[in-house]
Amino acid sequence: MALPRCMWPNYVWRAMMACVVHRGSGAPLTLCLLGCLLQTFHVLSQKLDDVDPLVTTNFGKIRGIKKELNNEILGPVIQFLGVPYAAPPTGEHRFQPPEPPSPWSDIRNATQFAPVCPQNIIDGRLPEVMLPVWFTNNLDVVSSYVQDQSEDCLYLNIYVPTEDGPLTKKHTDDLGDNDGAEDEDIRDSGGPKPVMVYIHGGSYMEGTGNLYDGSVLASYGNVIVITVNYRLGVLGFLSTGDQAAKGNYGLLDLIQALRWTSENIGFFGGDPLRITVFGSGAGGSCVNLLTLSHYSEGNRWSNSTKGLFQRAIAQSGTALSSWAVSFQPAKYARILATKVGCNVSDTVELVECLQKKPYKELVDQDVQPARYHIAFGPVIDGDVIPDDPQILMEQGEFLNYDIMLGVNQGEGLKFVENIVDSDDGVSASDFDFAVSNFVDNLYGYPEGKDVLRETIKFMYTDWADRHNPETRRKTLLALFTDHQWVAPAVATADLHSNFGSPTYFYAFYHHCQTDQVPAWADAAHGDEVPYVLGIPMIGPTELFPCNFSKNDVMLSAVVMTYWTNFAKTGDPNQPVPQDTKFIHTKPNRFEEVAWTRYSQKDQLYLHIGLKPRVKEHYRANKVNLWLELVPHLHNLNDISQYTSTTTKVPSTDITLRPTRKNSTPVTSAFPTAKQDDPKQQPSPFSVDQRDYSTELSVTIAVGASLLFLNILAFAALYYKKDKRRHDVHRRCSPQRTTTNDLTHAPEEEIMSLQMKHTDLDHECESIHPHEVVLRTACPPDYTLAMRRSPDDIPLMTPNTITMIPNTIPGIQPLHTFNTFTGGQNNTLPHPHPHPHSHSTTRV
């Protein structure tokens, strides 16, 4: 595993450049260069012994273990399990950023997994509501991985490939004695290896990196794979909305893990300048959020602005989904504090009280957010996440990273199963209930809900087969998939590609055959994970007990080649070609497919399945329903309040505002056939007896009327206000600079943020001096409101967290974007209500 001499100049040059960049301490240049060169040669001279794998890191020596894989084409992998990357976040360090681990003098055995971060288990089992099908179908097995819990849980696992596998030797032999073989070596044999850091999902509430064995991916792709534990739930994301507990500790754990990797992976033969982060579900949204945080900047090995990692793969999750960010963390902090007897007004005392509680008492509390949202997760704290993710993307904060992202065909499978009885299809009444419940939980304006419901029903009704329950089930599945995954992913890809940054988009259309999922299911959330990890190559496992076929093995090899190619070069097509003749004697279809870069104009994506092809504009009609039409419907009720992140409030204290009574009728702002004669208004659940031609006529008439009456009336005003909104973005969300980096003292940072807040207040007030407004930020895109629950209260202010007082006011029952009571459900009772209608979304 020692580096060849031809690679030494490359590392020496990197060390010299890093030294020059970091010479700010005033040390003599000669001494600085000498120290960097000694460090570099120490890294290069280390040899990883397969028999007794011992590595000396910056914190001490660790011993790994060699593991043979159950496939003759895969070489052995050396595993280093339970490696500490941070100090235990216990006691007064709870709800604090992580600190580097303490060094050790003896050899540390890294041969078994470390404890997982605390999470809620009931009678030894994780919650039943788990989204990935392989979680739900193997809940007992998954639960066995999270029994050993401890707050001392900040560890990672490293999987290092060896050079003696048949696949490696085959590629090396094919190179022969060609000149410049080092430059042409498509497997990176002998050189520093790319590094892939996997972030697990679980809705920021459950999971562990220990679940994901990176051995096959490391061996087949000749990359180093790392899996990480990070703090979850209340311990990882509690925020009081001020300096008492800023939140985002789980994200800071991941940043510390990347910092540790950048500084130590060279000892394992890894390349600190080729680090890729990837994850699925909530792990994918973490990946996206890390690309937007200035904490990810700064790699001591290089003067590059790309920071602690250079590439990112977001599988079935981005920062724009409704479940990606918690918009009212202080409310949930107060609820938790009340449950455990820490409900004091001063937030500093509140946090001190929570720090003294046993961790199990905290994680066992049931704090339920609105459906499709999260209670404890990443927050806009003005620091780790400086602003709303969409605004940061519009400003190009992630343009320095190569990004691959995508979705699965039927992500919303568990949403459908958890809402309605779908074994025999979906009845008309169940379909109506699901859509109404969906709208009530995601959109907070009562006057326009009737129009929105009918619009969604119209768009997701297959009019050629509208009476078929199985067809309704299929369209309902598409509704959840499109809103929660596809539209956010496409919006993210559009924003990233707008800056010319390399962007690749995929749609995954395959899943393994098993009796544990219904026959009608498509590729559901998490179904791509076993193929990324190469599980089909070693056969069924406890976590993935599928009947893998040769097609599954072939597809897994294809996916691993794409993923590891991207980690090596930023291009999934290079350098290793798609060659799976070791599985099939005939070429696979992927050999003839070139995965084209994504652009907003063409929106090209790769269809990953047994019949691969490059297509364009993935589900364009439905995507634009959510990204274009629905936001316009949301704002047609009151065009004078165009910016949906502001709302007028009386000059008196908002806590004195009376709530709307449940008995108050909710009427639509738009005339419909239903409102003409209330006596003939049908029940929302008598769909089977309803004349769909009448509904179609009504919907078309309403839509045509809205378009005709509003396009001419509001076109000019829309353009003017849209232009002003973008101008406000530029003024109110200033670009970050390195001046507010970690080198600032806390007092300087607080003062800086306070000054920004004061300046921005005056600047924003000049926009509407006659209005009293309550803002979550200077106006972001109106699609921000699409990601909030109806009872969201804007308690966090981007870039101004230090300005929030050290007390949390009483929980406000009103949503500031509308006038109905938070949490009110405007749908009629469902004949078969789901027992957990507000269960936390798991992604």
From Swiss-Prot:
GO BP term (any one): synapse organization
Residues annotated as glycosylated: 109, 303, 343, 547, 683, 686
Cysteines engaged in disulfide bonds, as pairs: 117-153, 342-353, 512-546
Extracellular face of the membrane: 46-697
Acidic residues composition-biased segments: 175-186
Membrane topology: Single-pass type I membrane protein
Reported effect, residue 815 to Y: Decreased protein abundance. Not associated with changes in subcellular location
Keyword Transferase: no
Subcellular location(s) of the protein: Cell membrane; Postsynaptic density; Synaptic cleft; Synaptic cell membrane
GO molecular function: identical protein binding; neurexin family protein binding
Null mutant phenotype: No obvious phenotype, but mice present subtle behavorial changes with some deficits in spatial learning and memory. In addition, mice have reduced brain volume. Mice lacking both NLGN1 and NLGN2, or NLGN1 and NLGN3, are viable, but have impaired breathing, drastically reduced reproduction rates and striking deficits in raising their offspring. Mice lacking NLGN1, NLGN2 and NLGN3 are born at the expected Mendelian rate, but die shortly after birth due to respiratory failure. They do not show a significant change in the number of synapses, but synapse function is strongly impaired.
Induction annotation: Expressed in a circadian manner in the brain with highest expression seen at Zeitgeber time (ZT) 6 hours.
GO cellular component: cell surface; dendrite; dendritic spine; excitatory synapse; external side of plasma membrane; filopodium tip; glutamatergic synapse; Golgi apparatus
Residue ranges of the TM segments: 698-718
Protein family per UniProt: Belongs to the type-B carboxylesterase/lipase family.
Function: Cell surface protein involved in cell-cell-interactions via its interactions with neurexin family members. Plays a role in synapse function and synaptic signal transmission, and probably mediates its effects by recruiting and clustering other synaptic proteins. May promote the initial formation of synapses, but is not essential for this. In vitro, triggers the de novo formation of presynaptic structures. May be involved in specification of excitatory synapses. Required to maintain wakefulness quality and normal synchrony of cerebral cortex activity during wakefulness and sleep.
Quaternary assembly: Interacts with neurexins NRXN1, NRXN2 and NRXN3. Interaction with neurexins is mediated by heparan sulfate glycan modification on neurexin. Interacts (via its C-terminus) with DLG4/PSD-95 (via PDZ domain 3). Interacts with AIP1, GOPC and PDZRN3. Interacts with NLGN3.
Protein name according to UniProt: Neuroligin-1
Annotated organism of origin: Mus musculus (Mouse)
